[in-house]
């Protein structure tokens, strides 16, 4: 009793619809990677430096650049073309590092580097010393507060954005202590305001 069993036809992987393979492409595929962002050139439009990627592609592979610009919708081209003058200038100012950080934050505006020291009266014959401006020298205020509290054996606290309050009258000693601990703060940039009201 022999029966004929038909063997199942196995489709070629090359044209298999389920695998997502394209029948018009030669395998293995050759993918062109961008020299700026190191992604395939089709994905450059999703990076923050689109104009740099486009310039690199236009310079090194003009035929691929022509294909990509023809495939782009008019909406995308208009969006890139409008801000190209200002975007080019901004590109010069910003520098992107690898790792996909995106736009780099602008640095804070530079303020004059000046440390002011003031003696403020409290109840009866008690005083507090206020030190302002250490943050302009990029000194950590928490570290400075701990240092002052340990050095003068008293309470010290960071009260404002750039203000340290030390319990006690240390206006005479604090100038020398600041210059000794942080040499970047020179004598000309320290100003003693004397006794001021709170």
Curated annotation (Swiss-Prot):
Keywords: Initiation factor, Protein biosynthesis
SUI1 domain location: 115-182
UniProt GO MF annotations: translation initiation factor activity
Compositionally biased tracts (Basic residues): 95-110
GO biological process: formation of translation preinitiation complex; translation reinitiation
Region (Disordered): 72-110
Domain of life from the UniProt record: Eukaryota
InterPro entries (UniProt xref): DENR/SUI1_TIF (IPR050318), DENR_C (IPR046447), DENR_eukaryotes (IPR005873), DENR_N (IPR048517), SUI1 (IPR001950), SUI1_dom_sf (IPR036877)
Keyword Protein biosynthesis: yes
Physiological role: May be involved in the translation of target mRNAs by scanning and recognition of the initiation codon. Involved in translation initiation; promotes recruitment of aminoacetyled initiator tRNA to P site of 40S ribosomes. Can promote release of deacylated tRNA and mRNA from recycled 40S subunits following ABCE1-mediated dissociation of post-termination ribosomal complexes into subunits.
Family: Belongs to the DENR family.
PANTHER family per record: DENSITY-REGULATED PROTEIN (PTHR12789:SF0), DENSITY-REGULATED PROTEIN HOMOLOG (PTHR12789)
Protein name listed in UniProt: Density-regulated protein
Source organism of the structure: Gallus gallus
Lineage: Eukaryota, Metazoa, Chordata, Craniata, Vertebrata
The gene coding this protein: DENR
């Amino acid at each position: 009793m022999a029966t004929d069993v038909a063997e199942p036809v196995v489709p070629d992987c090359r044209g298999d619809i389920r695998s997502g393979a394209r029948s018009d492409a030669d395998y293995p595929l050759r993918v062109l990677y961008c020299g700026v962002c190191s992604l395939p050139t089709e994905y450059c439009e999703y990076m923050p430096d689109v104009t740099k990627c486009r310039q690199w592609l236009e310079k090194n592979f003009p035929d691929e650049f022509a294909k990509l610009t023809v495939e782009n919708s008019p909406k995308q081209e208009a969006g890139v073309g409008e801000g190209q003058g200002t975007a080019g200038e901004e590109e010069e100012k910003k520098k992107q590092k690898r790792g996909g950080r995106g736009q780099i934050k602008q640095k804070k505006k530079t303020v004059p580097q000046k440390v002011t020291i003031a003696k403020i009266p409290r109840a009866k014959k008690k005083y507090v010393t206020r030190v302002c401006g250490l943050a302009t020298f990029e000194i950590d205020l928490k570290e400075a507060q701990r240092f002052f509290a340990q050095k003068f054996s008293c309470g010290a606290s960071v009260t404002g954005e750039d203000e340290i309050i030390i319990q006690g009258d240390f206006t005479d000693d604090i100038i020398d202590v600041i210059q000794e601990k942080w040499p970047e703060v020179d004598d000309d940039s320290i100003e003693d305001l004397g006794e001021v009201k709170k």
